[in-house]
Amino acid sequence: MAILKASEIRELSAEEMKGKIAELKRELMKEGVNKSTGGAPSNPGKISEIKRTIARILTIMNEKEAQAKNA
C-alpha cells in the first residue's frame, strides 16, 4: 500500500478509513512476522511508514469526530 497523504485521507468516508486501518494493520503484522523470523525486509522503512500512515488516519478520524461534536 502506498503512503496516503492527509489530503487524500480527508476525502475518505469513516467506513473507508476503518477499512484502510484494517488493511494497514494486516500489512504491518505481515511485515512484523517477516522481521521476527529473520527474513530480510523488502523495504527497511516500510514498518515505520505503515505505523505513520495508521497514526495519520486515526488523527484525522479524531479531528472529524471533534468537529462533529462542536457543530
Swiss-Prot record:
Matches recorded under PANTHER family: 60S RIBOSOMAL PROTEIN L35/50S RIBOSOMAL PROTEIN L29, LARGE RIBOSOMAL SUBUNIT PROTEIN UL29C
Stored InterPro entries: Ribosomal_protein_uL29, Ribosomal_uL29, Ribosomal_uL29_CS, Ribosomal_uL29_sf
Alphabetical list of SUPFAM superfamilies matching this protein: Ribosomal protein L29 (L29p) (SSF46561)
Keywords in alphabetical order: Ribonucleoprotein, Ribosomal protein
Organism: Methanococcus maripaludis (strain C5 / ATCC BAA-1333)
Keyword Membrane part of the UniProt annotation: no
Gene this chain is encoded by: rpl29
Gene Ontology CC: one annotated term: cytosolic large ribosomal subunit
Protein family according to the UniProt entry: Belongs to the universal ribosomal protein uL29 family.
Protein name, UniProt field: Large ribosomal subunit protein uL29
GO MF annotation list: structural constituent of ribosome
GO BP field: translation
